[in-house]
Amino acid sequence: MYYMLIGFIIVVIAVIGAGYILKRKHYQRINELEEKKIKLRERPVIDELSKVKKLKLTGQTEALFESWRSSWDEIETRLFPDLEEVLLEAEMNTDRYKFRSATHAENDIEQMLVVIEKQMDQILGGLKELLISEEKNAKESRATKEKFAELRREVLTRGFKLGETLPYIETKLSELSESLNSYDSLTDQGDHLEAREIVIVVQKEMQVIEAQMERIPSLLHETDTILPEEMTKLRAGYEEMVRKGYYLAQMELDKEISRMKNQIDKMKKNVINLDLDEAEQGVEELHNEIDLFYDTLEHEAEARHFVKENHSPTSDKLQRQNAVSDALAEQITEVKQTYHVAEDDLAVYLKTSAKLSEAKENFEQLTALIASGEIAYSAAQDTLKEIDAALITISTEQDKFAEELRSLRKDELEARDDAERMRRAIITLDRKMERERLPGLPEEYLSLREHMGESIDALEKRLEEKPLNMKAVSQDWRIAEEDLTHLTEKAEEMMENVRLVEHVIQYANRYRLRNKELADELVQAENHFYNDYQYKKALEIAVTALEKVETGAFKKVEKAYESKVSVDDIE
């Protein structure tokens, strides 16, 4: 019983302690919210409203002021009283240990303080802007009026430089003057915000007019003086070159100058209408066009020099190439008596001959046009370059064809010499095989030997044809060379096999008396060797038989053969 009482007392003390701590925390938060409320009440909203109220307000400014004052009245008469009630509710809930209700109330207070602070910020910000606007308007209006007066004076003193744009500029200035009068009227009435907007617009308009007054004189100078003078100089240069014999009708300068004059008239209208960007673009484009005409005249002068420098050399090239072509024609006639010339090859010559005739005709026409002054030198230059390029191509193709004709005789002699060489090679090969003392020659080799002779016969027969077809000769020549190579390889292989068979059988004889199977297979190999001359097959049988008795023996025999060591010395 005693311990239960002690436990109960401890629980009571703990509850009271916890309640005290929570109560203290809530009072601390309520005090912080109270301090924030006091700080908001101390903000100088009423003072600022009083300052602005002393100003003479009308229109938009007055409407804004009334909205700010209504907003403050709402704060004073509704929001702050509501805030006080919720603060009181929070204190009461804390005193009664209704901590959850107290927390809700405290959260509501925080939200209400945020709303009040935001509303007060809007009021003070608007009032401050209005006061600054009134002061700034006063300063900027003086500066704006001074700048306007300067523009007026500049128009009076420099108006002659503005030409026909002067009435438009004066109209703009009159409109700005009316705007400034409206500014004064609105300021007197107390509508400072709307007056501020007028000042800003007038400042921007004056900047535009000032920039226009800077650009207009130079644009008028371009359209009235510089561009007309440039066109006059262009025409003078054009006419001087025509007097010197240049053909320039392709430029159609009269038509182009008339068009450019119309462009200048259009640019002047753009300047008068103050479309200065478009006018500047037009001036730049027209200068570029005039520069292009000068480039054309300069190109014609350079082309004339080129034509005078290259006309005679081109004529000489034509004559030389014509002589080469005639000589090639004679060479073709002579060659055709001995050799067959393919139609494709003749077509190449005929094509180059036609190109040469065309180049000659173009040159004659060009010469006539230059003499009569009916062609621009630039066009004449292009034609000369085309003729020169054609002559280079013709020369290359005809030289190549001439070399092919000259090579026919050379190729014929080489083919005849090679046919003789191949016959000697066969005789040499036959003698070599005789020295080997072969048991005989297999049918396969004899067939190749016969075919080789037929290939040389075909080549020699082809070389006796009239006219001689060197393409066919080359084909037969190639076949004969391939056959000789094949025959030589077969002969070398056959002689190699014979030597190896002899070495293998000689080495295998050491086992012959002791091994009947080996002896029988060696007899079989010898039959192929001596009777049907199948030396490769004889080698295969002998090697297989020997390897059954002594593995690796063939490698030893082969090595001894390559080293020219006697079989008897192989261990």
UniProtKB/Swiss-Prot annotation:
It is found in: Cell membrane. Keywords: Cell cycle, Cell division, Cell membrane, Coiled coil, Membrane, Septation, Transmembrane, Transmembrane helix. The chain crosses the membrane at residues 4-22. One of its GO terms (biological process) is division septum assembly. Residues 23-571 are cytoplasmic. Residues 1-3 are extracellular. One of its GO terms (cellular component) is septin ring. The keyword Transcription does not apply. InterPro entries: EzrA. Residues 248-298, 326-374, 400-437, 478-529 form a coiled coil. Its main location: membrane. It is a single-pass membrane protein. Belongs to the EzrA family. NCBIfam families: PRK04778.1-2 (NF003408). Negative regulator of FtsZ ring formation; modulates the frequency and position of FtsZ ring formation. Inhibits FtsZ ring formation at polar sites. Interacts either with FtsZ or with one of its binding partners to promote depolymerization. HAMAP family: EzrA (MF_00728). This is Septation ring formation regulator EzrA. It comes from Listeria monocytogenes serovar 1/2a (strain ATCC BAA-679 / EGD-e).
